[in-house]
């Protein structure tokens, strides 16, 4: 099968492309810069330079694809100067742009990777898909709005999409806050953040990849 992957040069993307290649699938990776796409090219992926916020760079990008795996996002830890408008541009409008290409190309299966941040503060424990979402951060609000646009296209345009909300993903190649915490723990240090116990759900990147593939295949 042939898969189009957005956000392929991020943290999860290379792990996903590696697994798809090992399973005998062909990958087309959308990246903003070829400079970061070397490892993907080494895995045999087709590299397409483009930007989900620029519709003209996406024209017919999904043609001939059997699946779209949409990972591209502007994360809440990307930069402390990120504004709500920037989250809206990338996470919401960017999602609309790539989903329109999927509809146009009649891609038979689409997976939209979202975040538990879309849920925000939830009174239900454990939470379910039916739990009320009250995101309190601009990032979470943008992820929820992106989900809603995908669902609207499912209902109005027949987009064959599944949505996955990931918690904190960790594993090899992770350069973000989890790496900093692990390094501190190895030194016998573990900072207490906040004034009360804080539980964070974690998922290993290999499990995240398997979740994406299951959603794509079912």
Predicted regions and their residues:
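NAD(P)H-binding glycine-rich loop region in Rossmannoid oxidoreductase-like domains
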Residues: 34-41, 45-93, 101-104, 119
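Active-site helix of classical SDR
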Residues: 142
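Conserved Rossmann-fold NAD(P)-dependent oxidoreductase catalytic core, especially the SDR/UDP-sugar
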Residues: 93-139, 154-155, 162
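Conserved beta-loop-beta element that borders a ligand/cofactor-binding pocket
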Residues: 147-172
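Glycine-rich "substrate-gating" loop/helix at the edge of Rossmann-like oxidoreductase active sites
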Residues: 136, 167-175, 195-205
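SDR active-site strand-loop-helix element
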Residues: 6, 30, 68-74, 110-116, ...
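N-terminal Rossmann NAD(P)H-binding glycine-rich loop of SDR-like oxidoreductase domains
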Residues: 3-23
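Alpha-helical substrate-binding/gating segment
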Residues: 182-190, 200-218
